[in-house]
């Protein structure tokens, strides 16, 4: 019971810690936006002032009254046109082009305007060049920062996993493991519906308003439909892989489903903790009444009562079959870490500050996600050390994604950070894999009979996993 009561405390402490870090990140973003707005206002004021001086000096420089009158009319219209274009954010090239067309004395006007325009261009390039020097790092420093941040994100969750008092899928750890599994299911579903799928749709929502009204209604449906199809493709692909692996594993025993149901004596020591599929649930409901089950089986179970524990082939077969869900989760996590690596590499290409901010956001996202993956692997039959080693393998995907982002030239950094990096099918396909693992492998484990307190803790764990993803989605 103490083990069961420790888990909510860990979840609560984790929620408070990650929430505090999230508020710090949100405060940093708000400060940056305010600073950017002040800079924009100051730049717009200085631009208008310099142009006003130029207009005054230019109207002062003409001596012929009739030409000045004609020019004043033209210049007034140009000034009006510039004010309109300035409100819309157009550059100075349009004003210079209008002056060149409107005046016959091109040499005098072009000379006076060219001096003022050159001064303004110099000031603008100097202001724009300073952030470029700050943000764009040299190659060695860029790779060091990006790969170091990726290693940090991959290694940081292990410190949390060391604190989880679960060594294996044993009865004394079962209540805590069930709570961690519920947290994992909430994290997987929240990650799929609040992070991966919205980011897959985000590039299309950005491009849609730029299109004409007639094209928006037709072209906007195609990309959105493709995202939904890729999500379904991920679910179907994971289903096909699991059925194929189970068929191959069950080929040695002629019929896997029949063999598992035929050997209930074996499953009462191993299967109550490892069975994930629906066809094995009838045996799990009867495992608590071992004596009654043996009486029901009669002569079939009598001869097997003795050699149940030493019969390692049956146990290995059941354990290996039930680890399929764990390996499927690892495959989905590998693809997900690849997208995280793409985001980190692309953000550091945009600047050190943006890279650090993205690293903190991904770290907040990865810690609860890795805890859930650890619970799924332990539930699938791995020991604590095996589960941590397998999770370390998924760090290869993050490093590969970071390297791809650093080696790829071009592309908008904002779209990469938003999750649009890489092929458009990666995010929705990964989301489909997460949905499959959460609904097929994890949620059925939460349907077993449990005490009211245990059931309440499991529901709270699921809501805690979703709440973490809501917080992270808000920060992003």
From Swiss-Prot:
The similarity comment for this entry is: Belongs to the ZIP transporter (TC 2.A.5) family. KE4/Catsup subfamily.
State whether it acts alone or in a complex, and with which partners, per the record: Homodimer.
Q: Name one GO biological process term.
A: intracellular zinc ion homeostasis
* Species, as recorded: Mus musculus
Annotated protein name in UniProt: Zinc transporter SLC39A7
Protein modification: Methylation at some His residue by METTL9 leads to reduced zinc-binding.
Q: Which UniProt keywords apply?
A: Endoplasmic reticulum, Golgi apparatus, Ion transport, Membrane, Methylation, Phosphoprotein, Transmembrane, Transmembrane helix, Transport, Zinc, Zinc transport
Q: Where is the composition biased (Basic residues)?
A: 110-120
- Which terms does the record give in the GO molecular function aspect? zinc ion transmembrane transporter activity
Catalytic activity entry: Zn(2+)(in) = Zn(2+)(out)
- Give Gene Ontology CC terms: endoplasmic reticulum membrane; Golgi apparatus; nucleoplasm
**What induces or represses its expression, per the UniProt entry?**
Down-regulated in an insulin-resistant, and high-fat diet state.
* Comp. bias (Basic and acidic residues): 35-109, 257-292
PANTHER family xrefs: ZINC TRANSPORTER SLC39A7, ZINC TRANSPORTER SLC39A7 HISTIDINE-RICH MEMBRANE PROTEIN KE4
Q: Where is this region: Disordered?
A: 35-131, 249-320
Q: Give the bilayer topology.
A: Multi-pass membrane protein
**Residues with the Phosphoserine modification:** 283
What is the tissue specificity? Widely expressed. Highly expressed in the intestinal crypts.
Give the transmembrane ranges: 7-27, 146-166, 177-197, 222-242, 393-413, 417-437
Any Pfam family matching the protein: Zip
């Amino acid at each position: 019971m103490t083990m069961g009561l420790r888990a909510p405390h860990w979840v609560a402490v984790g929620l408070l810690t990650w929430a505090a870090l999230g508020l710090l990140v949100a405060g940093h973003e708000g400060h940056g936006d305010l600073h950017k707005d002040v800079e924009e206002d100051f730049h717009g004021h200085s631009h208008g002032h310099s142009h006003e001086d130029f207009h005054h000096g230019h109207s002062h420089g003409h001596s012929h009254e009739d030409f000045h009158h004609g020019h004043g009319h033209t210049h007034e219209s140009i000034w009006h046109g510039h004010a309109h274009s300035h409100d819309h954010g157009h550059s100075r090239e349009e004003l210079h082009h209008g002056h060149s067309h409107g005046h016959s004395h091109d040499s005098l006007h072009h000379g006076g305007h060219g001096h003022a325009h050159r001064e303004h261009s110099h000031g603008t390039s100097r202001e724009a060049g300073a952030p470029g020097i700050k943000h764009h790092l040299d190659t060695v420093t860029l790779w060091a920062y990006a790969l170091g941040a990726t290693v940090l994100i991959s290694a940081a969750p292990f410190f949390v996993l060391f604190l989880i008092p679960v060594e294996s899928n044993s009865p004394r750890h079962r209540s805590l493991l069930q709570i961690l599994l519920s947290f994992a299911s909430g994290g997987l579903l929240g990650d799929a519906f609040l992070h991966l799928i919205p980011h897959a749709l985000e590039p299309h929502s950005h491009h849609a308003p730029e299109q004409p009204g007639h094209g928006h209604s037709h072209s906007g449906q195609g990309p959105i439909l493709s995202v939904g199809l890729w999500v379904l493709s991920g679910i179907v692909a994971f289903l096909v892989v699991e059925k194929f692996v189970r068929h191959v594993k069950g080929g040695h025993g002629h019929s896997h489903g029949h063999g598992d149901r035929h050997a209930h004596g074996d499953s009462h020591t191993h299967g109550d903790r490892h069975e994930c599929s629906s066809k094995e649930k009838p045996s799990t409901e009867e495992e608590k009444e071992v004596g009654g089950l043996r009486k029901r089986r009669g002569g079939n179970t009598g001869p097997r009562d003795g050699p149940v524990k030493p019969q390692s082939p049956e146990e290995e077969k059941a354990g290996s079959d039930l680890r399929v869900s764990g390996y499927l989760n690892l495959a989905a996590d590998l693809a997900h870490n690849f997208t995280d690596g793409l985001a980190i590499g692309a953000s550091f290409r945009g600047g050190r500050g943006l890279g650090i901010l993205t690293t903190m956001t991904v770290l907040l996202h990865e810690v609860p996600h890795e805890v859930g993956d650890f619970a799924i692997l332990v539930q699938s039959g791995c020991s604590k050390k095996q589960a941590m080693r397998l999770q370390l393998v998924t760090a290869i995907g993050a490093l590969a994604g970071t390297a791809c982002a650093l080696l790829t030239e071009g592309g908008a950094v904002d779209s990469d950070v938003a999750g649009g990096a890489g092929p458009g099918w990666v995010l929705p396909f990964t989301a489909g894999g997460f949905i499959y693992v959460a609904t097929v492998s994890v949620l059925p484990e939460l349907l077993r009979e449990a005490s009211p307190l245990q059931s309440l803790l499991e529901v709270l764990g699921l809501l805690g996993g979703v709440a973490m993803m809501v917080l992270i989605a808000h920060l992003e």
